[in-house]
A protein has these predicted regions:
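Flexible, glycine- and charge-enriched loops at secondary-structure boundaries
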Residues: 19-26, 55-62, 93
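Conserved protein kinase catalytic core
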Residues: 10-12, 54, 139-140
């Protein structure tokens, strides 16, 4: 399961989550992550954090924030962070699928190599692959790797879709070019 962080597991902020003390877990997020684990999912956090490239803070800060995240929601198999800004045009910042591909390679040794944004949604590497996020950029990254897509309300987070996932729902529709 590819999972965005802010707005999915914890409340986001227009000024970034700048410290572990600012990380407020959305009620029910821990139980939702545990439900995914009980279903056999491996959890890969994929989060854009441009505050790093903006010089607001460094790697040590993101590690301390993610340490608190793991204390609060449980074991996370992979924590991927894109430090870049939109203008940096990297391959890891969502909606590009770089973080998801890298996490997939770490977890199962395979990833999607190319994305045809104008073509059909690719087949997932694993039929249970899913992306949970609160923004269209999350949905775009998930679409690019063929994952089932679950878009959440940022104030409710993962708890708003966990029952759909448990019920093996097909997920939300998304077209990356509309």
């Amino acid at each position: 399961a590819f999972v965005d962080r802010d707005g999915v597991l914890n409340y986001g902020s227009p000024n970034y989550i700048n410290s572990p003390e600012e990380l407020t877990i959305i009620p029910g997020a821990k139980e939702s992550v545990m439900s995914l684990r009980d279903m056999g999912y491996r959890i890969a956090i994929v989060t854009n954090q441009s505050a790093i490239m903006r010089g607001l803070w460094g790697e040590d800060r993101i590690h301390s924030i993610h340490s608190k995240l793991q204390e609060e929601v449980g074991i996370l198999d992979v924590l991927m962070t894109c430090p870049h800004r939109n203008r940096d045009r990297c391959q890891c910042r969502k909606p590009r699928p770089g973080m998801l591909n890298r996490a997939s390679k770490i977890i199962r040794g395979k990833s999607h190599d190319n994305v045809d944004w104008w073509g059909s949604k690719p087949e997932p590497i694993h039929p249970l692959d899913l992306m949970i996020g609160d923004r269209d950029s999350d949905m775009g990254a998930g679409w690019a790797v063929g994952a089932r897509l679950f878009q959440v309300d940022e104030m409710v987070g993962i708890t708003s879709v966990i029952n759909r996932i448990i019920a093996n729902d097909d997920g939300d529709e998304f077209n990356p070019v509309e």
